[in-house]
Amino acid sequence: MKRLLAGIGAVAATLVLAAPAHADVDTDFTNELHIYGIYGQKDYNAWIAKITCKRLNKGVDTTAAQSAKFVHDQLVKDTTTEQAWQFLGAGLRLYCPDKLPLLQAGQ
């Protein structure tokens, strides 16, 4: 019985002490944006993506085109339309993947 309890205790301790492996989504998002030549503050860019998801969830934007325009309007002046769409795609994939069909529909 003591061995069983010791074994259970060891397993429990291992599970408690094991650090969960959580990726930093904001950092992953920033790294992807850099591939597209989009720079800026990590927190600000993540905020834009999260607000974009919220706007879609609340029905403020109902199409990907409306969301891309919102994103474009928030980014620096020299941002291209293509970059806004790339930003939108990355944002939807990382922060609200349930909205990806909107992007895939091209609306």
Q: In which residue ranges do the predicted regions lie?
A:
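Mitochondrial intermembrane space
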Residues: A13, A19, H34, Q104-Q107
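Short N-proximal segments of mature Sec-exported proteins
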Residues: D24-Q74, W85-A90, L94
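Hydrophobic alpha-helical elements and their junctions with loops/disorder across both membrane
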Residues: T14-L17, L56, D98
